[in-house]
Amino acid sequence: MSILVKNNIHWVGQRDWEVRDFHGTEYKTLRGSSYNSYLIREEKNVLIDTVDHKFSREFVQNLRSEIDLADIDYIIINHAEEDHAGALTELMAQIPDTPIYCTANAIDSITGHHHHPEWNFNVVKTGDTLDIGNGKQLIFVETPMLHWPDSMMTYMTGDAVLFSNDAFGQHYCDERLFNDEVDQTELFEQCQRYYANILTPFSRLVTPKITEILGFNLPVDMIATSHGVVWRDNPTQIVELYLKWAADYQEDRITIFYDTMSNNTRMMADAIAQGINEVDPNVAVKIFNVARSDKNEILTNVFRSKGVLVGTSTMNNVMMPKIAGLVEEMTGLRFRNKRASAFGSHGWSGGAVDRLSTRLQDAGFEMSLSLKAKWRPDIDALELCRQHGRDIARQWALAPLPETNVKATTQEEECACAAAAAADLGPSMQCSVCQWIYDPAKGEPLQDVAPGTPWSDVPDNFLCPECSLGKDVFDVLATEAK
């Protein structure tokens, strides 16, 4: 089976309706995928890429029905990964001397996967051309680390088609090939999901590479990707989206995700979200339980967000395994221009929230104060969670927010705060390690230190909520020192 792309270019790839895991289990392909291979018939016959190795036999059989394999003059491999070049062994068994054009790095990868160093490799670099007859040429553009070292794109003059490799693609299987034929909302979602989960680590390379390609001043009538649709209707729309996504992208959105053992951390997540929306009803807030949610949807939402709140219960003094794994993936994705805060519940001892805060900071997030609750949050602890959400909403606001008056939850709390404010409670104290501030008027309810407790009356076993160090590391807050 083949599909006419344009003039003498046909799609000869393979749809994969059933695939649900990609790159091991790193990427959930909930809408399947396709492996796009293209056959060009000019004076010279050119095959661009193959398909995933599991479809090798079907691919060669289908290709044979389109063309005598011996008539293929050149094979172009834009990318050596197995979902692109996987059928090479099956194909080259039939036409072993056919020239293969690829980057130098691709030769290393292809021979590493297929173990045929004797194949007729021809190295190409940016700006190299290959004459295919009828006044047309292929122009090669290296795109290293988008997303492998061997990656390149191929441009066909005359027809003005850019064979873009993984860039501008999506794991999206449909019986229709072109972007104007499919559901536009689904297509946009899958494009963004693909960029967020695969190309985000290389965003710093995207803009200069697109700028380099545009600098050739070549018309682009179509973008033929390696996965998903071919962009024939306004193909530059996806290029414009990539330029936007590569520029430290964020929306007015906050993502909250958590894992919980006894529902306590979930209660905290809900209360924090309530506090955020009290202060800023316009910010989009989405909550995920990592044990019940699609991991790649969570990461896509993190990509879209200005900030993320991550919650975990404490298990053996460390964070929950699913949270640890997801934070490790976030580290690899190298998100930029994002803020973060950790929260969670614990029992007799903690540890997870501090560990999580450190990991998020190591992942490149700008950190805000964390929040902890001991055992199941009661009405007072949940109010602290809501207040944390209010504080986060103001700290992370993209524009100044109007002041709002939030009622105290109980009359007793109002009295306590008023009394604390009126009393001479002595100075606030600041942790010399993590800079957390103890305010005597507020106390530290999570350690049973009531509002209005002077520092001298704070128990000796008090621990800094942020770094878990004792009272001896605290100094008088500099602004209050006399």
Curated annotation (Swiss-Prot):
Binding-site positions, FMN: 260-264, 342-369
A GO term for molecular function: electron transfer activity
Disulfide bonds: none
Transmembrane segment boundaries: none
Keywords: Cytoplasm, Electron transport, Flavoprotein, FMN, Iron, Metal-binding, Oxidoreductase, Transport
Cofactor section: Fe cation; FMN
Domain of life assignment: Bacteria
Binding site for Fe cation 2: D83, D166, H227
Matching InterPro entries: Anaer_NO_rdtase_flvorubredoxin (IPR023957), Flavodoxin/NO_synth (IPR008254), Flavoprotein-like_sf (IPR029039), Metallo-B-lactamas (IPR001279), ODP_dom (IPR045761), RibonucZ/Hydroxyglut_hydro (IPR036866), Rubredoxin-like_dom (IPR024934), Rubredoxin-O_OxRdtase (IPR016440)
Record's GO cellular component terms: cytoplasm
Record Pfam families: Flavodoxin_1 (PF00258), ODP (PF19583), Rubredoxin (PF00301)
HAMAP family hit by this protein: NorV
Summary of subunit composition and partner proteins: Homotetramer.
The protein's name: Anaerobic nitric oxide reductase flavorubredoxin
Classification of source organism: Bacteria, Pseudomonadati, Pseudomonadota, Gammaproteobacteria, Enterobacterales
Gene transcribed to yield this protein: norV
